[in-house]
């Protein structure tokens, strides 16, 4: 099993999808806690998509700037409404990097809003 950690950005093959689900191979943020990440193959991720002005206006979409730490190559959006479980043993393509603590805190806040925890 891979050593995966909360806040890592990994490339994931999200196909097949249905309806309006986010698809393709794309970066995703691991949001499950590290106990689950170490013990089970199914983890929860937030897909990352290309930035655009319309998506940036949605309160549960988090703006991410590229950095050497996170491994992103362009300005992006963490689409917290599209949070989903994946089996990383089947869908993981590669590890890109790690979110900063500040960006992970913003993602946490958006997830709380999506699930009604705030």
Model region roles, listed by residue range:
Residues 1-118:
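Conserved functional hotspots at enzyme active or ligand-binding sites that engage polyanionic ligands
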């Amino acid at each position: 099993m891979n050593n995966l950690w909360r806040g890592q950005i990994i490339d994931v093959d999200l196909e097949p999808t249905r309806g309006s689900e986010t698809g393709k191979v794309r970066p995703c943020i691991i949001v499950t806690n590290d106990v689950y990440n170490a013990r089970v193959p199914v983890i929860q991720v937030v897909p990352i998509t290309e930035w655009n002005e319309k998506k940036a206006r949605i309160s549960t979409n988090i703006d991410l700037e590229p950095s050497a730490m996170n491994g992103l190559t362009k300005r992006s959006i963490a689409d917290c409404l599209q949070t989903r479980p994946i089996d990383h043993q089947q869908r993981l393509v590669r590890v890109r990097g790690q979110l900063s603590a500040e960006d992970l805190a913003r993602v946490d806040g958006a997830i709380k809003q999506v699930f009604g925890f705030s």
